[in-house]
Amino acid sequence: MEKGTRQRNNTAKNHPDRGSDTSPEAEASSGGGGVALKKEIGLVSACGIIVGNIIGSGIFVSPKGVLENAGSVGLALIVWIVTGVITAVGALCYAELGVTIPKSGGDYSYVKDIFGGLAGFLRLWIAVLVIYPTNQAVIALTFSNYVLQPLFPTCFPPESGLRLLAAICLLLLTWVNCSSVRWATRVQDIFTAGKLLALALIIIMGVVQICKGEFFWLEPKNAFENFQEPDIGLVALAFLQGSFAYGGWNFLNYVTEELVDPYKNLPRAIFISIPLVTFVYVFANIAYVTAMSPQELLASNAVAVTFGEKLLGVMAWIMPISVALSTFGGVNGSLFTSSRLFFAGAREGHLPSVLAMIHVKRCTPIPALLFTCLSTLLMLVTSDMYTLINYVGFINYLFYGVTVAGQIVLRWKKPDIPRPIKISLLFPIIYLLFWAFLLIFSLWSEPVVCGIGLAIMLTGVPVYFLGVYWQHKPKCFNDFIESLTLVSQKMCVVVYPQEGDSGTEETIDDVEEQHKPIFQPTPVKDPDSEEQP
């Protein structure tokens, strides 16, 4: 894992005679081919990516986790509302960062540019090992659970069946994403519309219930009746469970370079999508408690299916199908965006360089998509979905906070750089206070879960110094990596994107500064600066 520009050029240097050959293999060897990621994501598709990634499985799974930890219906609803508001605050911070640093890769790119290569690599490392494979595995398992649950009305579906169907879902959507960016965005648009219709049905049924007088658990004296002893650590875990349901609000930042007019469409999509999702989530949870008691909700393995069975009668089959389609679209959106994160990391030299390549005709990052799919399939061996959600929530909030803190650092160190959007510093401060609350009490309540997440993240430190920072690797190792890259290129028919078309061109100064943070007490000379011509 060497620096991106050197990886892109070494093949062409070794095979200069292939420059005039136009075959896919020759294009792969030359590292060019004139292909680039296309700007095909407009405002509607951008909103579809945000909404589609947020509304995956969380609203259909996490209500159980939120209620269980909150201890009462009223407090659970407050958790949903506050989490939505904090998500909107975080999205405002990311909107400013997204137009200030207009690069794909999202918070990875922001952390790397502000705090340096090691910090950025740790964000990428934990994303590769835990966050995004876990997120996709949870959504895929939820998809299979909602598909199979009607076939097993008196018991839970078998674990082997759940995992097999989840794997089939992942493989199918990986093929779609590898085939065409347009296909992937169309699938996302269609399934986002479908999941909004499913949630609209839930909300409408809830309104009908309220009109009938079925709002026992919404009355204040009943809503705040605790069914367990209040515990501030468990309340923090309730916020983590809720944050999983809002997870994906920052995914559009991963595909900034494929956005049409990102300076306008990135903030517009955020401003439209986050309030919409918050509204839908709060009223969907209100609808749930009009038909189910807290005990019934906690006993259900598929909350939306139980809700449909109680209110739809013979038409109850609509709900599991709607939820399955919703989570299917969630897997598609997560594959689409997380593969761009790995693509961006490889382009910076933080992952194997083959992951920074795209297909010569389809212009899709096939190696990054295959890598994403494989890592998610490996994650499917983990059985406890709610433990996975806790891992994702804690580690995500850790890096969300670091990224938002970077916004303050960037304001201080680079006050004069262009900022098409400039929000009040009160917003990042509010977000960081909430972030600190979650982390402190999560560590107190679940030290083992949080400690495992931190330990996995710290394993990236030696990997960074051996794989990225160490430039003088043995020649046999470099030759092996280059041979493996060439074989992968020919198998996938992929090349490096043409520089300049996506706004990612690098200068010598960019390369020299690659591992240097904007915020550093004293300048440190990059080892590669001596190798620059």
From Swiss-Prot:
Organism: Rattus norvegicus
Name this protein carries in UniProt: Large neutral amino acids transporter small subunit 2
Binding residues for L-tryptophan: N135, N396
Family classification: Belongs to the amino acid-polyamine-organocation (APC) superfamily. L-type amino acid transporter (LAT) (TC 2.A.3.8) family.
Gene that this sequence comes from: Slc7a8
InterPro entries recorded: AA/rel_permease1, AminoAcid_Transporter, L_AA_transporter
Biological classification of the source: Eukaryota, Metazoa, Chordata, Craniata, Vertebrata
Topological region Extracellular: 67-74, 151-158, 212-231, 289-313, 384-387
NCBIfam families: 2A0308 (TIGR00911)
Places the protein is found: Cell membrane; Basolateral cell membrane
Residues bound to L-leucine: I54, G247
UniProt activity-regulation remark: Leucine transport activity is inhibited by 2-amino-bicyclo-(2,2,1)-heptane-2-carboxylate (BCH), glycine, L-isomers of the neutral amino acids and histidine.
